[in-house]
Amino acid sequence: MTTSYMNGHVTEESDSGIKNLGLASPEEHPKHREMAVDCPGDLGTRLMPVRRSAQLERIRQQQEDMRRRREEEGKKQELDLNSSMRLKKLAQIPPKTGIDNPIFDTEEGIVLESPHYAVKILEVEDLFSSLKHIQHTLVDSQSQEDISLLLQLVQNRDFQNAFKIHNAVTVHMNKASPPFPLIANVQDLVQEVQTVLKPVHQKEGQELTALLNAPHIQALLLAHDKVAEQEMQLEPITDERVYESIGHYGGETVKIVRIEKARDIPLGATVRNEMDSVIISRIVKGGAAEKSGLLHEGDEVLEINGIEIRGKDVNEVFDLLSDMHGTLTFVLIPSQQIKPPPAKETVIHVKAHFDYDPSDDPYVPCRELGLSFQKGDILHVISQEDPNWWQAYREGDEDNQPLAGLVPGKSFQQQREAMKQTIEEDKEPEKSGKLWCAKKNKKKRKKVLYNANKNDDYDNEEILTYEEMSLYHQPANRKRPIILIGPQNCGQNELRQRLMNKEKDRFASAVPHTTRNRRDHEVAGRDYHFVSRQAFEADIAAGKFIEHGEFEKNLYGTSIDSVRQVINSGKICLLSLRAQSLKTLRNSDLKPYIIFIAPPSQERLRALLAKEGKNPKPEELREIIEKTREMEQNNGHYFDTAIVNSDLDKAYQELLRLINKLDTEPQWVPSTWLR
């Protein structure tokens, strides 16, 4: 399946309302089609030879002659040394005794290779001091001029860098080769030895037979053969047809990539069509292509296993690769785009504030790689290289999701939501004489993320998309306040009161403030904080109250300091608040844990209220359900979790479990809380 490759870029022509926002209309014909295909790693490149100048060629020839002479001198010395040592050993060898085993006789034709001759590495300082010495030795003006020219060259930074590279290559080329297995069938050789030893009754032969039959030796031989078999496998020789086909593409730089394609390993790449070309469009995190680092966006695929790809549709390429396994040979034209090396990206964790289904998204560049999620899910974003389409994993699916999925980038999603709202507003009929009023009301109905420092500032509104999160484990002596929120008659007050009654030593309520006079049985600081109206209004202006209201001409409210006093005492503060108070509380330093108490179905809610002796009307039940939807839509981004109160006892146990989990497991909180 393929989808339009919009990639969120600005298009020249689009429908009204879309052009200004830089988004292509879903009805437009796509410029590109992007398809996810397998593309394993183990990649390699082959470059065309570099043309040398005549002067460089002469220098190279002189260096080659000097190297050849040094090799001949070294081999001559080595041969003389080997001959001398062999004569000495032959003179010291005693006559053979015991069993004549032809298998272990040293073949005369085998000469063990000695390590490469040592190469003395000159440093720039050595070269400079030698030239200085020569300069003092020579007296004629021409020689002095030549030496001065050489000294200037040696002091040049580019020459010094090239000299260091030369030394590094020389050291690498003269390193001894790693050990290479002589044979890959030691087990067969051991069986032959055991066959030879069968008729032997001497103690040494029987001891060798027992040793070769020991389980550890057998396991060692098996491991040796497995490793040797892999080491001795020759790399498949590139088919001559591949090199012949390169000539068909003129003077273009071509690279050949050989891939071992497994059936169960995702390769993580997408391709798109550009005219007749098939272009690698995207490298997906987690796939073999990304891990290899050798396959790049913008590479053009010319051939796969000798099959020409130019002119094929991405669907044909997908079908072709789905039937191919084993060794695949790709002929590619490298991308001409010059990109800076990618910086090491850090994973960011975000909480989604909207639902997303890629199957309903006409803008997703590759629907097969789209990652669906729901409001409240935690996403681990591992790549923002494409600002319009992030690559991410969903929390809990990392092990089952080998490849990262595509999710809308924050700015792209904000543009899209703004476009939708603009279109919806344009479609609404505007009544004559009420234009400004209508626009004002529409603006207030928008779902916005408020500025933390300006609670009522509509000019700083931001469409809800993602919120960066971090893990936080509450300290044992500083518990997070538990906030219960929900529509009336949904049980949040009953749950709060049950917790307070059953575990008084663990839970406490914040002492509210009031402006009314103290009654005889009330204790200041225990029942209420009694303050003057002037002081209360000053605290309201200073933003010290989480929520407040007026009843019978007296002000009542819960302050941030009252909640902090409960936290400092080591207890868990329990609050039941209105939805309008959540923003102020969340923007404080209290780190609240907000639990939404949702009602069950309408019929179940009627039964629960009937048990309490209440007989609500149908319209009252519908109002509760509608209020629930409204609270979830407007304030759901504040909720940490939700409990459906279909049974008060079960809801109480679930509430207690969630509170206990805060002591044992870290929770996701806004990153701004920890900065």
Curated annotation (Swiss-Prot):
The L27 domain 1 functions in targeting to the tight junctions by binding to and stabilizing PATJ. Residues 120-177, 179-235 form the L27 domain. This is Protein PALS1. ATP binds at residues 486-493. Residues 256-336 form the PDZ domain. Heterodimer with MPP1. Forms a heterotrimeric complex composed of PALS1, LIN7B and PATJ; the N-terminal L27 domain of PALS1 interacts with the L27 domain of PATJ and the C-terminal L27 domain of PALS1 interacts with the L27 domain of LIN7B. Component of a complex composed of PALS1, CRB1 and MPP4. Component of a complex whose core is composed of ARHGAP17, AMOT, PALS1, PATJ and PARD3/PAR3. Component of a complex composed of PALS1, CRB1 and EPB41L5. Within the complex, interacts (via HOOK domain) with EPB41L5 (via FERM domain), and interacts with CRB1 (via intracellular domain). Residues 21-140 are annotated as: Interaction with PARD6B. GO terms for molecular function: ATP binding; identical protein binding; kinase activity; protein domain specific binding. The gene is Pals1. It is found in: Golgi apparatus; Cell membrane; Endomembrane system; Cell junction, Tight junction. InterPro entries: GK/Ca_channel_bsu, Guanylate_kin-like_dom, Guanylate_kinase_CS, L27_C, L27_dom, L27_dom_sf, L27_N, MAGUK. Residues 1-32, 52-79 are annotated as: Disordered. Belongs to the MAGUK family.
